[in-house]
């Protein structure tokens, strides 16, 4: 489940 925004990648890096 990934949003169309590229923010998910940045958040992933921040969260992980």
UniProtKB/Swiss-Prot annotation:
Gene Ontology molecular-function annotations: cysteine-type peptidase activity
Entry superkingdom: Eukaryota
EC main group: hydrolase
Protein keywords: Hydrolase, Protease, Thiol protease
UniProt EC number: 3.4.22.-
GO BP term (any one): proteolysis
Family label: Belongs to the peptidase C1 family.
Entry protein name: Putative cathepsin-like enzyme
Phylogenetic placement of the source organism: Eukaryota, Metazoa, Spiralia, Lophotrochozoa, Platyhelminthes
